């Protein structure tokens, strides 16, 4: 995942993200993923060492051969030949060409879900800035409910003059549109990002693109954006849409502040009936 709004990246959802140095980005837009730090971790793995970031999977695998870690689940989507190529084609110092990439353009979001925080939602951010930090709330050491997440959007809600977003567009137009199998866009809420709609407009002008687009959405944007998303799917050869809920009705609305259950359900049906979806 690359969080373009904050200029951070990680290759898995278990390790913490690290900053992408702008100096590395100036040398190559591929540094959005191929940071010098990741290359050192890559070398550790090739040398048979265990990077500390991967301890979650090591612990699972050390429990016995019948225990399957996320490392296996994340790799099974690729063929054995593709995995072998990834190991043998590149020296650890080289920039790896990606097959899948997940990005978040920014943290703009119209929800404040209870399991989220201000680093990933501007609604959370605005709540803490207006009402102050949550008090007497048991949380982890990151103090997620005490901070306003300002580090996550240093370039503002419109990503003005963001070198990370600029690097993505350069990489996308020159290489990624030809080499990727899947591009996934998450958030925040994807439909609230102007860069997301820039990507949608690009696809409408380039409908022959073979890349599969996957979008994570809360399916709760304004009706005009919902219709725009539905219409845009017809410009794609392969469009996957992901949404989720942990409960139904009032319980779902309690967990996801901003959600209107009936609207979400209606939008799910709308996308399935009117959208051009490969997978939902």
Role assignments for model-derived ranges:
Residues 98-108, 119-164, 178-194, 206-225, ...:
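Core AdoMet radical
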Residues 64-99, 109-111, 132:
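Recognition helices and adjacent regulatory flanks at domain boundaries
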Residues 169, 200, 226-230, 265-272:
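Generic structural signal for well-ordered alpha-helices
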Residues 1-78, 97:
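Accessory C-terminal segments flanking Radical SAM cores
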Residues 58-62, 116-122:
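Detector for the c-type heme attachment site
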Residues 52-55, 107-114:
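Cys/His-enriched microdomains
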Residues 81-92, 161-174, 223:
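A Trp-anchored, charged/polar loop motif used as the substrate-binding/catalytic surface
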Residues 170-176, 200-206, 230-233:
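Leucine-rich repeat
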